[in-house]
C-alpha cells in the first residue's frame, strides 16, 4: 500500500504573516504572547493544509528564525558571549544581535542558516521544541511525526574553536569539524542529548521520528559512515522508529545508506537519476520503508503526473513499503500560485508552488487507486507539460551557430591590458566602488509610487536622474578614479534584468524566505531568453555624460541570473546560461558603442551554484566559465570587471582564472587580507584585483590605517600594478553619512600609498 507524506511546507504564510509577526515583535509593536499566538495560528494553518492532502504530517517545522538555530538551542550549544539562555531574547540575539552567529548558505540553495559554534563539550537538552510542538498538535487531535535536524548534519555544518598559528602567534579560530577526531569528539558529547530527546518523545507516545540528514548527499569519507552507523545504532536502541531524510542530490554511498539501522529512508528522485538507478539495480531492504521524493521541492513546475504514476509503479516492484513525497523541503517555493494574475499567457497552468505540490502528492496516490478526478488531472498535466512552449527560433539559431571563438576575447589579457592602460590612464591603486549606492527611503517610496501607478514613468525617470547626478557629484568630490551610476533604478540585481528579458517572468506574490524574516521573489525562466531592448543604456550613458572620468556599465552575470532564478527543465542548464549570456552580450555591445570603456559583470553566485559532489564540478564550471566568457566578449579596449563577494576561493581559483576578465574585485576586509594568499599560491596569476578594504556590512567608518594594512598585506604577495582599491561589496544598504567619510578615507589612503611607493599623485 502506498502512503502520502510531505515536509518543509513554507512557514511564510499566504500574506507573509510570518514576516509581519517577527518584524512587529522586533519593533516592539506586539508582545511576546502575541508573537507566540500568531505563530501557533500559522502552525495550525500549515498542519491543516498537510491534513487535506497527505497522511503523514510533520511537526517541529515552524522555526521562529532558523531550524539550525533551533537545534543549537535545543542541545544547549549557547556560545559564552551570550550569557545564560533567556528565552527569545537570547534566541534573537544569537540570530541578529551585534555578535550574532555566522550566516551562510544552506547547501547549494538560496536559504541561509546560522552556523552553530560548539565551544565546549558539555551539552544538555535545553529547550525541547520537538516535544512541545508534538504536544501542541496532539492536543488539537493531530498526530504528527517530529522532524529534527540529524546529529550528523548538525555536526557537519557546525564550527568549533581550533588553535592555529598566525605570524608566529597562537590564535583561536572557528573551523568546521573536518577531521575524524573532531567529529568523533562532538558526536560522543552530543549523542546523549539526542537520546534524551528521543526518550522524552517516546514517553509522550511518539512512535516515529524523522531526522533530516542532507549532509549524506555530500562527499563523505569512510569514517563519516562509521560515525553515522554509531549514531543511528545508539538512537535506534531507544525504541522509536527512525526515518532519515536526504535531499538536494543522490546519497553518496547507496549500500551504506540502506544498511543504516533505521525504519525509513527518503530519497531525492528528482535532482538526478543516480538514486533511482541504485534502487532499481541493487534493490531495497524489505524491512524498510522507501520514501520516494518524486515531486520537485526546488522548482515551481507542475508535475507530469503520468510520468510520476509510472515511476511509482516501477518502485512498487522493488518495495511494497512505499511512501510518495516531495524531493526536498517545500520552503524553497512560494506558498501558492493562485493569486498570480499577471503572468505571461500559458505560464500559470504550468506552475505548481508549495500548496499545489501537496495536491500533486495526493493526486498521484489517487491516480494509482484509479480515482476519476485524479486520472483527469494526470491527462491534463501530461498535455500541458509536453506541449511546446515559449520557444524563440532566433535564439535557437544563435545558440546553434556558436563556435569556440565566441567564448574567447580577441586578444589575450596582457595585450588587452596595455591597450586599456593607454586609454584609461588610471593611477596606481585605482579607486572605485562595487556598484550600488545607498537606497534611501525616498528611493524606495518613489519606486513603489511608480509601480503602483501613482507617478508617471517620466516623473520616475527624472527622479532617478537626480539621484545619479548626486552620486556622480559625490564621487567626483571624493576623488574616485572609476565611477558608478549608483543603481538607484534597481531593487534587486537579478529581478531588474528578469523584468527586461523575454523568457523570464516575475511574480507579484511569489515570496520565499532567505533567512529570518528576509524574503525575495525568484524570477522564473520559462522560455528561450532574449533581450528585446537595451536594459541599462539610458542610466549609464546619462551618468557618463556628467563626467570625464570612466563610468562602469553594471550587469548581473549569466550564472548568477540562472542560479538565483527558478529555471526550466526541458533544456540543459548550460543552454539556459548561454541564452542569458547572449542577451547580456548584446547589452555589452550597446554599452561599448555608446562609449562606455569599463563594464562590470557581477557573478556572486558563481561558486554557490556548484554541485554538492566535487566529481560533478568539471561539468558545472565548464559551462559557468563559458557563459561568462560569452557574455563578456568585449572589444580588447573595453576593460571587463567582475565581482565576487565571498571569500572561499581556494577550491575554485583555477575556474575563476579561466573566466578571462581584466579585473576582479573581492572581499578582503573581514579576512584581514588573508584571501590574498590564494592568489599568491596560484602560479602565473596576472589579472588585476580590486581589494575589498572595508566591510560594508558594518556601519563603522574604516580608518585609513585599517585599510592600508590590508593593502600592505596584498602588496607583499602581488605586484602593486595589479591592485585596485574598493569596498568589499555594494553600498546599497548603508547611509550616505556612513559612505561618504568611508570612501574619503579610502581614496586618501590610496593617495598616501602612491606617495609612499614613490608615485606622483
Swiss-Prot record:
Chain segments annotated as transmembrane = none
The answer to whether keyword Lyase applies is no
Catalysis performed (reactions)? 5-methyltetrahydropteroyltri-L-glutamate + L-homocysteine = tetrahydropteroyltri-L-glutamate + L-methionine
Q: Which GO terms describe its biological process?
A: methionine biosynthetic process; methylation
Q: Which UniProt keywords apply?
A: Amino-acid biosynthesis, Metal-binding, Methionine biosynthesis, Methyltransferase, Repeat, Transferase, Zinc
The residues the record assigns to binding L-methionine are 434-436, 487, 602
> What pathway does the annotation place this protein in?
Amino-acid biosynthesis; L-methionine biosynthesis via de novo pathway; L-methionine from L-homocysteine (MetE route): step 1/1
Q: Which cofactor does it need?
A: Zn(2+)
Q: InterPro entries in the record, alphabetically?
A: Cbl-indep_Met_Synth_N, Cobalamin-indep_Met_synthase, Met_Synth_C/arc, UROD/MetE-like_sf
User: EC number(s) in its UniProt entry?
Assistant: 2.1.1.14
Entry's SUPFAM superfamilies? UROD/MetE-like
Name by which UniProt lists this protein: 5-methyltetrahydropteroyltriglutamate--homocysteine methyltransferase
Q: What is the lineage of its organism?
A: Bacteria, Pseudomonadati, Aquificota, Aquificia, Aquificales
